Design a protein with these regions (language model features):
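Active-site C-terminal subdomain of aminotransferase-like
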Residues: 29, 207-289, 303
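Conserved N-terminal alpha-helix of the aminotransferase class I/II PLP-enzyme fold
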Residues: 47-93, 100, 122
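A glycine-/small-polar-enriched, mobile loop at the entrance of the PLP active site in fold-type I
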Residues: 17-68
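Active-site phosphate-binding strand-loop segment of PLP-dependent enzymes
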Residues: 24, 123, 134-190
């Protein structure tokens, strides 16, 4: 029968898992994958997979509610913030943010990489987008000083990409927005450390880096920003209010993705929450950065004070040598170390689920 065939296949394919340094979709905790595999055919006595379950069913309602409640616990999200599980990735938020938050049709953007730049270009479609600081002059290898920014008087928000996946930089101090709303794309650092949600008007994160499979984007938005007052022509599906009112069930959500995110939230809670996660991430990053700082062959590309704990780009200075390193690493079971084409060299993405052994 099917089951014995499946078990036989499993025996045959006793594959060892590689160390996957992909920037996203990225490594997920092995325990979570095993648990999902065990529940694949029959989720807790329902006789069906979560993939097959109606999003309006009692069983699924419990899954999505628990996912939200665990996320609230992890980040200590106050009651006056909504949690939304949406689709369209972080890239769709580049449009949703201005559509919903641009009241004066103006916003300030800090350009620290490809994704901040894309958000800025998208913002410019809907109103006046001002680039008030940028690190483009040095290939985005640092975070500009944001202590005294020329914040525009009429700006509805100041926008940052908090961790720059491609360039390996991170804001360790949030910008002084001079009283303006702060909007942050946290896709590649989400849940890697504790965060004071109250410092932001809106946070969003694509799930496929630190929390789950691709297809889900998590939005945390202060409820006074969730209104009917959106740019004219904003589609129903692109209004935060549509999804907040329907508790992320306005239409069929990415049900399986949310279920997987929920499992990762439980995994994080079991490991001591975000304080413990930050400590572990610091330990992993330190091993790698210390090695790069002492190495005669490799060097990191980021200004020390702005180094990300999640994405670590490094180079040898010789393209052929870089290519050889990537090739030999792959043969040794270290996958996806090739750097982004705009930086070259290598990049190790060492998200929450990357075990320390993969780095050390």
């Amino acid at each position: 029968d099917m089951c014995s065939k499946y078990n036989h296949l499993k025996e045959e394919n006793k594959m060892s898992r590689v160390y996957n340094f992909s920037a996203g979709p990225a490594v997920l905790p092995e325990d979570v994958l095993k648990e999902a595999a065990a529940e694949m055919l029959d989720y807790r006595g329902t006789g069906m997979s979560v993939m097959e379950m109606s999003h309006r069913s009692k069983a699924y309602d419990t899954i999505i509610k628990e996912a939200e409640s665990d996320l609230r616990d992890l980040l200590h999200i106050p009651d006056n913030y909504k949690v939304l599980f949406l689709q369209g990735g972080a890239s769709q938020q580049f449009a949703m943010v201005p559509m919903n938050l641009m009241k004066n049709k103006a916003a300030d953007y800090i350009l620290t990489g490809q994704w901040a730049k894309k958000a800025y270009q998208e913002g410019a479609i809907y109103g006046k987008a001002n680039a008030i600081a940028s690190s483009a002059d040095k290939t985005f290898s640092y975070i500009p000083d944001c202590s005294d920014l020329p914040v525009s008087e009429d700006a509805d928000y100041v926008y940052i990409c908090e961790n720059n996946t491609i360039y390996g930089t991170k804001y360790w101090t949030l910008p002084n927005t001079k009283g303006k709303l702060l909007v942050a794309d946290q896709s590649s650092c989400f849940l890697s450390e504790p965060v004071d949600v109250t410092k932001y008007g809106l946070i969003f994160a694509g799930a496929q880096k630190n929390v789950g499979p691709a297809g889900t984007v998590i939005v945390i938005v202060r409820e006074d920003l969730v209104t009917e007052d959106v740019l004219s022509g904003t589609p129903t599906m692109l209004r935060y209010k549509t999804h907040a009112d329907a508790e992320s069930l306005y239409n069929t959500p990415p049900t399986y993705g949310i279920y997987m995110c929920g499992k990762v939230f439980k995994w994080l809670k079991a490991r001591g929450g975000l304080e413990a996660m930050k400590e572990y991430n610091e330990k992993k990053a330190e091993i790698l950065y210390n090695f790069l700082d002492e190495s005669q062959l490799f060097k990191g590309t980021v200004v020390k004070k702005d180094r990300s704990l999640m994405n670590v780009p490094f180079v040898t200075g010789d393209e052929e040598l870089d290519a050889l390193f990537v090739k030999e690493s792959k043969a040794a079971g270290f996958e996806n170390l090739k750097g982004h084409r705009t930086v070259g060299g290598m990049r190790a993405s060492i998200y929450n689920a990357m075990p320390a052994e993969g780095v050390g």
